[in-house]
Amino acid sequence: MSVQEHKQEAPDIVRCKVITVSDTRTDETDKSGKLMISFLEEAGHHIAAYEIVKDEKDALQRSVLAGCMDEQTDAVLLNGGTGIADRDVTIEAITPLFSKELPGFGEIFRMLSYTEDIGSAAIMSRATAGVIQHTAVFSTPGSSGAVKLAMNKLIIPELAHVVREIRKDK
């Protein structure tokens, strides 16, 4: 079966939980979370939940697992906490939970960041994606430029296809 045939079998609507990881953002100042939601809604997807979670490993794991275990959620999208500062713990929180990792997401995101956005600073991005409890999980940096790049070039074009692949044998 071709990639196009797989995409045709993918769901039209993906139910998503959006998590902004930040010690400082609020509902009023969370530009990147709102941008992520806007891209998802414009693509016809449904926002099942949205929250802002502090840069704390246990709190992040609880929030991600709650989304992944919710039968009304097909994907969890995080923004923030992917850098190399001590408080950036998103990757440490979610990667141990992955049953499968999608290394191509981070690799291609960094390549696009290098060529189209921030140049050599892309080496500090630890964006990643994987599968937790038959749920797609994507983690992007928290800058609005990074969210826009990830959503436009990678997540929106493949989100439904990824969900289809994860759930086809379930």
From Swiss-Prot:
Pathway(s) annotated for this protein in UniProt: Cofactor biosynthesis; molybdopterin biosynthesis
GO biological process: Mo-molybdopterin cofactor biosynthetic process
A GO cellular component entry from the record: cytosol
Any one Pfam family match given in the protein's UniProt record, by short name: MoCF_biosynth
UniProt entry keywords in alphabetical sequence: Molybdenum cofactor biosynthesis
Source domain of life: Bacteria
Gene3D superfamilies in the record: MoaB/Mog-like domain (3.40.980.10)
Oxidoreductase as UniProt keyword: no
PROSITE patterns recorded: MOCF_BIOSYNTHESIS_1
Family assignment from sequence similarity: Belongs to the MoaB/Mog family.
Function: May be involved in the biosynthesis of molybdopterin.
Protein name per Swiss-Prot or TrEMBL: Molybdenum cofactor biosynthesis protein B
Organism encoding this protein: Bacillus subtilis (strain 168)
Phylogenetic lineage: Bacteria, Bacillati, Bacillota, Bacilli, Bacillales
